[in-house]
């Protein structure tokens, strides 16, 4: 409840779990072998789906427009040119969708009524619809060919991070600027909270920034 003290609970599965979100009064987590589990309280979990054997679901995001859905983007653990994308209204019943370049996506977020996806070779795509109309995804010019692993939004600014210390910022998703991260380590995740961006990566890298443009290593205790 405070983020400091944690209690182990049984998840109802033995598969590795990769991502979790909370919406519509429930937690939904996804992981290896297409596993989807749900919980209303975080203590008691139920396996609701096995979307595709041998497939790892690495990301899940919730967004709302005309219709609200959970969306989880699947990534094959083996080398493949194809990726599977699923949508769900309730987190229990899932429908497979066709999404071009899905296998190249690393992360998806929902911000400002847009689904925003980042992936290999600097790919950034946005969609104002997201569900049922996958051809509406628009490629954005990102200024880099480095693989992108994560994106976040806060304080009126988008921040995307990736391989070799790549950090890019944008206020409108159309014009991106590469900024100096001060590291060459791969950066795997970005988040925003309490007026600050936080980025983490390999070799124990933790960076913080108040504006997304100037970054400093976090103090180690």
Residues covered by each model-derived region:
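Residue-level hotspots at or immediately adjacent to binding/recognition sites across diverse folds
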Residues: 1-221
């Amino acid at each position: 409840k405070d983020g400091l003290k944690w209690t182990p609970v049984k998840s109802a599965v033995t598969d590795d779990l990769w991502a979790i979100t909370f919406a519509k009064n429930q937690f939904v987590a996804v992981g290896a072998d297409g596993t989807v589990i749900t919980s209303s309280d975080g203590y008691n979990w139920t396996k609701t789906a096995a979307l595709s054997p041998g497939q790892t679901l690495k990301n899940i995001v919730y967004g709302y427009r005309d219709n609200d859905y959970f969306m989880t983007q699947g990534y094959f653990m083996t080398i493949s040119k194809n990726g599977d994308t699923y949508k769900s209204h309730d987190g229990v019943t899932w429908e497979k969708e066709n999404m071009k370049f899905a296998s190249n996506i690393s992360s998806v977020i929902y911000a400002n009524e847009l689904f925003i996806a980042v992936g290999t070779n600097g790919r950034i795509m946005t969609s104002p619809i997201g569900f049922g109309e996958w051809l509406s995804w628009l490629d954005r010019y990102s200024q880099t060919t480095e693989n992108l692993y994560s994106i976040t939004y806060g304080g009126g600014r988008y921040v995307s991070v990736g391989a070799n210390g790549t950090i890019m910022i944008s206020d409108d998703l159309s014009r991106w600027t590469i900024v100096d991260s001060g590291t060459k380590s791969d950066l795997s995740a970005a988040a925003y909270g309490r007026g600050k961006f936080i980025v983490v990566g390999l070799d124990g890298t933790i960076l913080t920034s108040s504006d997304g443009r100037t970054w400093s290593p976090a103090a180690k205790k």
